[in-house]
A protein has these predicted regions:
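A short glycine-rich, Lys/Arg-flanked "PGG" loop and its adjoining helix->strand segment in the class I
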Residues: 122-137
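Conserved class I S-adenosyl-L-methionine
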Residues: 137-169
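A short acidic, Gly/Pro-enriched loop at the edge of an enzyme's catalytic core
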Residues: 96-109
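Class I SAM-dependent methyltransferase Rossmann-like catalytic core
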Residues: 1-46
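Core SAM-dependent methyltransferase catalytic element
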Residues: 175-176, 184-202
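A short SAM/SAH-binding and catalytic strip from SAM-dependent methyltransferases
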Residues: 107-122
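Class I SAM-dependent methyltransferase SAM/SAH-binding core
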Residues: 37-40, 44-99
Length: 202
């Protein structure tokens, strides 16, 4: 897909996200097997340097803390509770996709189970490319669990099987990334399904 249709990024609930996420939610949005699969992917990709966790919360799914972990999200209470975080930033990416960091600040940018909520994902990923060092990775993991009223309509309109290609296309349109890699990490028969899309900063 070279462009997204009109209405793709509309949502059922168009209230500001700062209102929706005002109350902290100390829950995980994946089951234990899917969380373990996210952690295993991070290990396989060697995400041990300076990492930015976009749309983060009280937990980041690293088995071992990276050298530094900057968590960016909407709820300060959740971010403050994240034990691996070395820096915390409250920022609404749907209000402003511009990341408040210098060029080349990070070795990896991760987004776990939140890419479906972005109304300007291509701009956010272009910003991710800007703040990544050459050779760094953008890593998106996602399942079929979500707050459906906050997910964009385009995401809801395509099958689970096609969603990884949507995320890959977001990366292509963002520019500055090598061809994205797509993998289904868990098939969902015994746990939450899990897909991963990652791309290296050129």
């Amino acid at each position: 897909m070279s462009a997204f249709p009109d209405g793709w990024f509309a949502r059922t609930d168009e209230r500001p996200d700062t209102e929706f996420y005002a109350q902290p939610r100390f829950v995980t949005h994946l089951d234990d097997a899917a969380i373990a699969a996210v952690s295993a992917l991070y290990d396989e990709l060697g995400l041990t340097g300076d990492v930015l966790d976009l749309m983060s919360s009280w937990v980041s799914h690293f088995r071992t803390a990276p050298r530094s972990l900057t968590v960016l999200g909407l709820n300060a209470v959740e971010l403050d509770a994240n034990p691996m975080a070395t820096a915390r930033v409250v920022h609404d990416l749907n209000a402003s996709p511009v990341l408040p960091f210098e060029d080349g600040s990070f070795d990896a940018v991760v987004n776990c189970v939140s890419i479906d909520y972005l109304v300007r994902p291509v701009e956010v990923l272009a910003e991710a490319a800007r703040v990544l060092r050459p050779g760094g990775a953008s890593v998106c993991t996602f399942s079929n669990r979500m707050f459906s009223t906050k997910a964009v309509r385009g995401w809801l309109s395509v099958s689970e099987r096609d969603r990884p290609q949507v995320v890959a296309e977001y990366h292509r349109q963002a520019g500055l990334f090598a061809e994205p890699l797509v993998e289904q990490r868990l098939d969902g028969r015994r746990s939450d399904p899990l897909w991963a899309v990652w791309a290296q900063r050129a």
